[in-house]
Amino acid sequence: MTELQAKDPRTLHTSGAAPSPTHVGSPLLARLDPDPFQGSQHSDASSVVSPIPISLDRLLFSRSCQAQELPDEKTQNQQSLSDVEGAFSGVEASRRRSRNPRAPEKDSRLLDSVLDTLLAPSGPEQSQTSPPACEAITSWCLFGPELPEDPRSVPATKGLLSPLMSRPESKAGDSSGTGAGQKVLPKAVSPPRQLLLPTSGSAHWPGAGVKPSQQPATVEVEEDGGLETEGSAGPLLKSKPRALEGMCSGGGVTANAPGAAPGGVTLVPKEDSRFSAPRVSLEQDAPVAPGRSPLATTVVDFIHVPILPLNHALLAARTRQLLEGDSYDGGAAAQVPFAPPRGSPSAPSPPVPCGDFPDCTYPPEGDPKEDGFPVYGEFQPPGLKIKEEEEGTEAASRSPRPYLLAGASAATFPDFPLPPRPPRAPPSRPGEAAVAAPSAAVSPVSSSGSALECILYKAEGAPPTQGSFAPLPCKPPAASSCLLPRDSLPAAPTSSAAPAIYPPLGLNGLPQLGYQAAVLKDSLPQVYPPYLNYLRPDSEASQSPQYGFDSLPQKICLICGDEASGCHYGVLTCGSCKVFFKRAMEGQHNYLCAGRNDCIVDKIRRKNCPACRLRKCCQAGMVLGGRKFKKFNKVRVMRALDGVALPQSVAFPNESQTLGQRITFSPNQEIQLVPPLINLLMSIEPDVVYAGHDNTKPDTSSSLLTSLNQLGERQLLSVVKWSKSLPGFRNLHIDDQITLIQYSWMSLMVFGLGWRSYKHVSGQMLYFAPDLILNEQRMKELSFYSLCLTMWQIPQEFVKLQVTHEEFLCMKVLLLLNTIPLEGLRSQSQFEEMRSSYIRELIKAIGLRQKGVVPSSQRFYQLTKLLDSLHDLVKQLHLYCLNTFIQSRALAVEFPEMMSEVIAAQLPKILAGMVKPLLFHKK
């Protein structure tokens, strides 16, 4: 740090020579210490060595302590010598004391206080406070250990550590056997110092009584311009600091010997016998003197960390790093500012520049990785570019990422946990957001819902994502840019995404979508072109009804997509389609399609094919006599739901033939069209489920109950699959979906049993499955005959009411939605909208047969009464099922796994009245 230039290299300088007038100007050379070579001769006063003072002078030291004086010369000579003081510091201090004994003392005391503050370790050891600067007697020695005359007080080995971290000992008493000019070896140096190997080139002392030669030592000092021989015994350091270099390269474990090649932690003069002498063993078990830094005896003795040179630029840079800690979040420098980086410890490092912002913070680590990119700062080399298209998010997590600092090279930290990659810009091409959208698994609600939730999303890999990580719904900019294949409709996600009107279906005779086909496909749109304008953002999903149009921001004609003028003939249409439908129905026109009955009907091409336009009007639910019933509120509510119509791109089996036959009719004929949502319910009806019962063996109660439980398990899986395809059900929260299935699975099974018994055997027997049909005779032989009679009431009611298939489908959905928890559901508003929609669908299904308001109202009352009566009937089944489950071992009845979970978790709640049944009529 301090560059010394010899003005007269030919003048010899002995150990006792007086210091030059200009030599006291450098505050970093040493403190004022007693001279270990007091018996030596003094050289001429003409030998002058002028130092170049560094910039820390006048910055670190003030003049507040000039009045302090040492007690006496004897006390100074009796002061203990630190094992980390340099030899040159003692010589120079003795020369400086002869001229001005107070000024160097002032500098050394303040330097002692400043360095004690900077380099003191953090932790509980800091409770030992260092003496103030004005009271300190010894200072730091920056250049090397100070050698005493008596070889018995010299350590056995010369320490290889930088002496900056060692603190001098406190005053010691007079030592016997040593002169006034000799130093007493400190007692607080820890014993592990004795285990250090001697450096190369060291020569053992011949004996205790032998003293080192007092001849002037000639020291060769390496300067920038070459080698220069100086007569002074004080060592001259290279102008380029080396301590940080050793820190960056090796962490300070090994250092070069004095005679070795340069590049070590500390440079010492060459061919100096004082630095090649070994040291004898030190005294042990001595207490640490007050004010001594614990690093001198604890950290430095075991952890050989090289010490940074006291350079003002380096201190300024380190202080800037600590103050501006936000720019070092990714590396280890933010946590330990003086610790070496975690690069390759043996890699050589370049010389350290001494600017205000050094580039030596991290050593170079070879070529940067391809997946690395600068997290902070504006500097980004051409080789470190983010590959937005080719590189995936997993590539960066597999390899360590180089972090670039401003003005520094890349340093890799492979053993640090990598922070997440910063979010990229939104993709510019459509479909990228769906591909890049992350998926998060949803934890099960309770232990009872684990198996059911696993079945709900068995082959999908994970339940649908929710919250802020939900897949982005398709929101195309225009209606013509969103098309769907005719064989499937993607299911709506959970409540976090925009609801889809139609879920995955299996149409046109194709097999229904299984678990794999029901996976949400983000890259596909979710509705048909005529309904794109009805898509609402997530914030509006809970405010407006799903199947109504009263609160929609814009009213669109369901036939051609033009702006609707009102509800005409029961459907929200424009004036053009209203007039067209009126003329087509009142006039005697037989429209035929020139194509395949699949022409596009929109605002521009609505006049091209009147046959397809009329077909679409009829399919949407337009009825010529609908305007006659506007005075009746019920009919008006019923017709308002006709807005939700199946678009033209969906075709059912034999659709073209049936519609072609219905379109070529006379005005006197009556049109019977099934509402589109009911058609969807027909298409998602589960297949036939078999019980696997062996009818060749005699019936026993245990065998029949076991077969019924196995059938119930399969039907429960079928209910889960059916509910996933149910329009509007997937818009509910996943917890609500599981809760509704657990509360209603028994009602759905017994209701399906009544429908099969009504359709296949006219209600004369209980049609559990094609391989398990119980007649009255077989029922009487069973122990649960009374339970069979309870279940037999449902098909008998079907026979009495002559329930149609459309009515059954709507009532089945309402059974799924007829029981909720007392505290309500998470998506209660969506649930109420869905339930109201299917109630209106039931009204429309009733209107297919019952003509007139009064018959329709009576029919609605009868069917809803039947739904209310199922609550009490199913309660008996729940009680019997729970009792059988509790006594299953004694009764030798087997219960499948998922069914057991549902029974154990939910049936006690239901029987205890912890659920809320939704009734249509008050009791």
UniProtKB/Swiss-Prot annotation:
Residues 1-164 are annotated as: AF3. Signal peptide: none annotated. Belongs to the nuclear hormone receptor family. NR3 subfamily. The modification Phosphoserine is found at S20, S82, S130, S162, S190, S213, S293, S344, S399, S666. The keyword Disulfide bond does not apply. Isoform A and isoform B are expressed in the pituitary. Residues 1-556 are annotated as: Modulating, Pro-Rich. Residues 1-11 have a biased composition (Basic and acidic residues). This is Progesterone receptor. Phosphorylated on multiple serine sites. Several of these sites are hormone-dependent. Phosphorylation on Ser-293 is highly hormone-dependent and modulates ubiquitination and sumoylation on Lys-387. Phosphorylation on Ser-344 also requires induction by hormone. Basal phosphorylation on Ser-82, Ser-190 and Ser-399 is increased in response to progesterone and can be phosphorylated in vitro by the CDK2-A1 complex. Increased levels of phosphorylation on Ser-399 also in the presence of EGF, heregulin, IGF, PMA and FBS. Sumoylation is hormone-dependent and represses transcriptional activity. Sumoylation on all three sites is enhanced by PIAS3. Desumoylated by SENP1. Sumoylation on Lys-387, the main site of sumoylation, is repressed by ubiquitination on the same site, and modulated by phosphorylation at Ser-293. GO terms for cellular component: axon; axon terminus; chromatin; cytoplasm; dendrite; dendritic spine; nucleus; perikaryon. A motif (LXXL motif 2) lies at residues 115-119. InterPro entries: NHR-like_dom_sf (IPR035500), Nucl_hrmn_rcpt_lig-bd (IPR000536), Nuclear_hormone_rcpt_NR3 (IPR050200), Nuclear_hrmn_rcpt (IPR001723), Progest_rcpt (IPR000128), Znf_hrmn_rcpt (IPR001628), Znf_NHR/GATA (IPR013088). It comes from Rattus norvegicus (Rat). The keyword Membrane does not apply. GO terms for biological process: cellular response to estrogen stimulus; cellular response to follicle-stimulating hormone stimulus; cellular response to gonadotropin stimulus; cellular response to luteinizing hormone stimulus; cellular response to wortmannin; diterpenoid metabolic process; epithelial cell maturation; estrous cycle. Residues 1-49, 67-111, 152-239, 333-371, 412-435 are annotated as: Disordered. A motif (LXXL motif 1) lies at residues 56-60. Coiled coil: none annotated. There is a cross-link at K7, K387, K521 (Glycyl lysine isopeptide (Lys-Gly) (interchain with G-Cter in SUMO)).
